[in-house]
């Protein structure tokens, strides 16, 4: 009798363990992280508004890049990704910086944040592959001390290179550039997003990873562009019959704080279109601010620590359940500058298709 009872108890525990494993396998974990391109481009914007010569602004920007430890910061972010092990990572500001003798020949790579991050993840034994890449901008500007500085700005989707059950994969990967783009001092500044269908067993949903236009203090057209981009995103997704997850850097404060620089109607417009804002839903009353962890574009160049005052790194859902939402911060060692791996807090959410 005791042996029968022991066998029954063992079988019950085995079933519970199997059920728990199955439940764990039936969720998808997604992380969104703006990894900070190494400059807020404040010097360049000042030059475009006529506040300093453009070559001087380019020299300052390059000096800021040299001081921002892009390679080391990629390691800090990789450490957080390796700890969380999300199935998908949506990244913004994944930049490639190049220099050259002039703007027509700026071909020499100086910093490549994507290479740094993938290499660091591999070293940690948690490899990821590039599932989608959205080249948003590619512009070279003349300097004084350097001939030219070239920025290639990218949004990237990473997928974890690990077997899991039920079968997990991405399909229908698409790269999009918004029709609405910021015009600033003779430069066109585009923004973009990546979409994919995420499959888990016989379930699927659409993932849209976005980076909307940032605000420019004292320049209302930047907000108009951002609002138009968000509407274009919503219009594109409106015909989707599958559930939808939208994540990324929206540059719109979801807390609706009228005192912050990113006080725009975009987050509210997405809610009004029938989407649930995940952090607000799961952490009611917790502001969960994600930006900025430090300041940049200062003279002299420095990166003082800052308490975040707005929540712009977000998840929105339609027709799919978000189970959890947590924040991750890539803290640097004492005395390191900048004091964090990025000026943005990362957000990790788990979904059950």
Q: What function would you assign to each model-found segment?
A:
Residues 8-17:
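Bacterial N-terminal signal peptides
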Residues 22-143, 147, 227, 353:
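N-terminal, active-site-proximal structural segment of metallo-dependent hydrolase catalytic domains
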Residues 30-35, 73, 77-103, 158, ...:
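Active-site beta-strand/loop signature of hydrolases that rely on acidic residues for catalysis
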Residues 60-67, 175-185, 212-226, 254:
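Surface-exposed cleft-lining segments at the edges of enzyme active sites
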Residues 121, 130-209, 323, 330:
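A well-ordered secondary-structure block
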Residues 168-169, 235-245, 252-353:
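Metal-dependent phosphoester-hydrolase catalytic domains
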